[in-house]
A protein has these predicted regions:
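Secretory targeting and sorting signals
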Residues: 1-35
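Short acidic, glycine/serine/threonine-rich helix-capping segments at coil-helix boundaries
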Residues: 51-117, 167-170
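Sec-exported extracytoplasmic/periplasmic mature domains
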Residues: 65-72, 92-100, 112, 116-120, ...
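Active-site beta->alpha N-cap acidic-glycine motif
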Residues: 113-198, 206
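C-terminal domain-boundary segment and adjacent tail
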Residues: 120-129, 155-159, 172-174, 283-320
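Acidic-and-aromatic substrate-binding clefts and catalytic sites of carbohydrate-active enzymes
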Residues: 142-148, 166-177, 197-204, 222-228, ...
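CE4/NodB-like, metal-dependent polysaccharide N-deacetylase domain
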Residues: 154-167, 187-188, 195, 203-229, ...
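His/Asp/Glu-enriched short active-site or ligand-binding loop at hydrolase and phosphoryl-transfer sites
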Residues: 227, 232-233, 237-268, 301-312
Length: 320
């Protein structure tokens, strides 16, 4: 069991990401065909063409100048007019900061509108896609056994609670966690790597590997230890994924009793928070979840409601 946890604030994330140096990005599809796209900075947003990797022309320069003006690295200090890997990475990084944008590296009407006119809800790394005031109870890593997993999943469901569960791929391979079973019982399952390394110590290609099977393949992921840097962020974006960490760390992995963990959750949680716990420790059971729910209710806070079933990928917002 890994015990070290490190939280990186959203403010640091946004500020640092804007100044991120260009990193090698996943190659687009080999059949991608570029086209010459023409527009100017005075062209109405609604009339600007959709831009993709491989495109060239004056409209690409307009895009690049906007990105440079916002502090995003495009792999060059000036607009080249070629939509290459540097521009692709910058677009993805920008899209990942806006809650309602799809992270696909394509500059269509919605992305153009956000780039030019601003607006749109900023994505919170710590609270994730939760747009409600309800508290999300999340559990990482791996349960002690498959029966312990089933008991907690069914217990939370019986309480009307949806959990966010972040198992490692090794845990799934060991047969102690089933993503499909958790989803069938109304819980959200997100990526937590395959083998739980510190992703900030890995190369871009190695991070991308950790975001794939046998780990959970989905639209959100939690880097082990809450650790991420420019390389990690770009790897997530290249997979169309957003990073989701936490607001409240219970430190249950230090051996805290169930009562201590429950008290921490109730004392420190605020509206809309995501709480970090671990499936292998003392609060991954129905009685602990019930105590958290009732304790938070006494403070006027609800917990994320169980929708009955969930899907392998999740919408850009979760209302809980």
């Amino acid at each position: 069991m890994n015990t070290t946890r490190r939280h990186v604030s959203l403010r640091f994330f946004v500020a640092a990401a804007l100044a991120a140096p260009l990193l090698l990005l996943a190659a687009p599809a080999p059949d991608a065909v570029g086209a010459t796209r023409t527009c100017s900075s005075t062209t109405a947003v609604a009339n600007r063409p959709t831009l993709r990797y491989g495109d060239t022309g004056s409209c690409v320069k307009v895009l690049q100048n906007i990105l440079l003006g916002k502090g995003y690295s495009i792999g060059s200090s000036y607009a080249t007019g070629t939509f290459g890997s540097g521009t692709l990475g910058a677009v993805r990084r920008y899209q990942s900061t806006k809650l309602t944008l799809v992270i696909d590296g394509v500059v269509g009407p919605t992305t153009w509108n956000r780039l030019v006119n601003g607006g749109g809800t900023t994505y919170s790394i710590s609270s994730g896609p939760n747009t409600s005031a309800r508290v999300i109870l999340s559990f990482d890593d791996c349960p002690k056994s498959y029966s312990a997993f089933q008991s907690a999943v069914l217990g939370a469901k019986s309480l009307g609670v949806a959990l966010v569960l972040a198992p490692t791929g090794n845990c799934i391979s060991a047969g102690r966690f089933s993503p499909s079973y958790a989803r069938a019982n109304g819980h959200y399952v997100i990526n937590h790597s395959i083998s739980h390394p510190n992703l900030s110590n890995l190369s871009y290609s190695s991070v991308r590997y950790q975001l794939g099977s046998p780990g959970v393949v989905t639209s959100y992921g939690r880097p082990p230890y809450g650790s991420y840097d420019f390389t990690v962020r770009d790897a997530y974006a290249s997979k169309g994924m957003r990073i989701w960490t936490w607001d409240v760390d219970t430190s249950d992995y230090t051996g805290r009793t169930q009562a201590q963990v429950v008290n921490h959750v109730v004392t420190y949680s605020r509206a809309g928070d995501t709480v970090l716990m671990h499936m292998g420790w003392n609060a991954f059971n129905k009685s602990a979840i019930a105590a958290m729910k009732s304790g938070l209710a006494a403070k006027g806070l609800g917990v994320c409601r169980n929708p009955g079933t969930t899907t392998p990928t999740y919408p850009k917002t979760i209302g809980c």
